[in-house]
Amino acid sequence: TFGVDSGKWYWEARVVSGQHSFIGINGYDTKTTADRGGETAQDAMIRQNTGNLRTNGGDSSYGSSYSDGDILGFALDMDNGKFYVAKNNTWFNSGNPANGTNPGKTCLTRRTLAACAPYDNKSFHYNFGQDDTFRGAESSAGNSDSKGRGVFKYAPPSGFLAMCSKNLPDPTVPKGDE
């Protein structure tokens, strides 16, 4: 994936085998390991066996645990520094990314990317809009973002876009003499 420092982004991940794993976001320059997910202020990782949110190296109550086959939704609002997580289309902590209420994490200030820390060969299948069947494990739902991009199991929150290169702004490249 790639890191983002502005915009509102949505992606999903299906838990293939996630016992004791972490999944969420990391700062662009953060190293994550299975036993140390969410170690800095920029990071926010959901712990599989508890549903707690780990940030700054400590856990706080946030959501419910997830199991194999669950689909996690992630909404990252870099414009307002907020991060949300859903399980099977229900946002943890009664969060509402479209309205900006009850995020799991606030104060995101630097380039951030989707991340996971699988433990003991556990795995997730990510969907950044490329495959809402998660390699044929789910039936297609055909939800896309407001620009008609991506295909997701669950509808992205209003104002959030698929985290794909087509949704990135065009770069401004100065002329050679500037």
Q: Where in the sequence are the language-model features?
A:
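PRY/SPRY (B30.2) beta-sandwich protein-interaction domains
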Residues: 1-178
